């Protein structure tokens, strides 16, 4: 009977380990998705919470407050952005550490142009307190280009095919907070701050 119990216990332990790995993969994949949405919503607070609290920002210092300064500067270079996660790979170092790549298409509105970039984010992840975080993100691009015909200009309307004005990115409560007091900068970046 002991042998059968040991075998059953071994199966349960292996099943638990597999389930743990699947849950970790899903949590790490959600990091990339949450990053894209937070960036597009200008939700800087939630963007920062995706990183370890002692994130190394290189020559600028350590910590989320240092990272905040960087993201606020970067995100004020564009008005609307759309980040699309198109693929994700994950390699586990051990149960609490992993590396990965996130393939991402990023679109940025800059004044009268829309810039599109095909990126690969090289990530390092760590689990702390049962939750996965970014330790590091290093973006690299295959290309960055201007759309041939930007989705605005003299013949463009902000109304969609159904006649409704798009609600994004203004639907995100953090969007208004981010741009509050910066209407002049927004006007430099877009003709249609819907």
Predicted features along the sequence, with ranges:
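Short, low-complexity N-terminal intrinsically disordered segments enriched in polar/charged residues
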Residues: 1-37, 41, 49-50
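A structural preference for long, well-packed, hydrophobic secondary-structure segments
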Residues: 25, 104-105, 114
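A solvent-exposed, acidic/Ser-Thr-rich amphipathic alpha-helical stretch
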Residues: 43-110
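Short, surface-exposed coil-to-beta transition loops
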Residues: 83-85, 115-121
């Amino acid at each position: 009977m002991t042998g059968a119990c040991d075998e059953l216990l071994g199966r349960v332990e292996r099943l638990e380990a597999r389930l743990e790995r699947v849950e970790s993969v899903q949590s790490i994949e959600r990091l990339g998705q949450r990053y894209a949405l937070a960036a597009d919503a200008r939700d800087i607070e939630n963007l920062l919470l995706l990183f370890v609290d002692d994130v190394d920002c290189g020559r600028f210092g350590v910590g989320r407050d240092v990272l905040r300064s960087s993201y606020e500067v970067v995100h004020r270079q564009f008005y609307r952005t759309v980040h699309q996660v198109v693929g994700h790979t994950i390699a586990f170092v051990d149960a609490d550490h992993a590396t990965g790549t996130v393939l991402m298409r990023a679109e940025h509105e800059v004044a009268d142009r829309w810039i599109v970039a095909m990126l690969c984010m090289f990530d390092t992840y760590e689990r702390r307190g049962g939750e996965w975080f970014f330790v590091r993100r290093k973006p690299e691009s295959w290309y960055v280009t201007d759309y041939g015909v930007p989705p605005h200009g003299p013949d463009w309307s902000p109304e969609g095919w159904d006649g409704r004005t798009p609600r994004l990115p203004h639907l995100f409560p953090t969007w208004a907070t981010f741009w509050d007091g910066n209407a002049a900068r927004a006007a430099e970046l877009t003709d249609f701050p819907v």
